[in-house]
Curated annotation (Swiss-Prot):
It comes from Arabidopsis thaliana. This is F-box protein PP2-B3. PANTHER family: F-BOX DOMAIN-CONTAINING PROTEIN, F-BOX PROTEIN PP2-B2-RELATED. The lineage of its organism: Eukaryota, Viridiplantae, Streptophyta, Embryophyta, Tracheophyta. PROSITE patterns: FBOX (PS50181). Residues 10-56 form the F-box domain.
């Protein structure tokens, strides 16, 4: 061993089944899952699981994402929804996922709003 060489030590997580690690990671955020994957081989493998990324998606994601959009994995879908908003409800709303928290975000377009005082001369 050369001086200054870093020797990886076994992780206490190495003995856990992958589905157990996947379950633990699914209680975090997409960002935390990516960080975890970068620090441990056991985590890296577990983070690739669709079961992890399915939990980061909103419960109603399948009704929001058009069938014409095909994704190879739930991770790819999650990343896509963080980068590219989807127009929903006939273009009256825009839907995406927050990159940091994974929370569902919806923006209303002016077409989707009714402002009762818009024609009032007072305003």
């Amino acid at each position: 061993m050369a001086q200054g060489e870093i020797v990886p030590r076994p992780s206490p997580f190495d003995g856990l089944p992958e589905n157990c690690i996947s379950n633990i990671i699914s209680f975090t955020t997409p960002r935390d899952a990516c960080f975890a994957a970068s620090v441990s081989k056991a985590f890296e493998s577990a983070v690739q699981s669709d079961s992890v990324w399915e939990k980061f998606l909103p419960l109603d994601y399948s009704s929001l994402v058009p069938e014409s959009r095909v994704f190879l994995s739930k991770k790819e879908l999650c990343f896509s929804l963080c980068r590219v908003p989807l127009l929903i409800e006939g273009g009256k709303k825009s839907f995406w996922l927050d990159k940091t928290s994974g929370e569902k975000c919806i923006m209303l377009s002016p077409k989707g709003m009714v402002i009762s005082w818009v024609n009032s001369p007072q305003f």
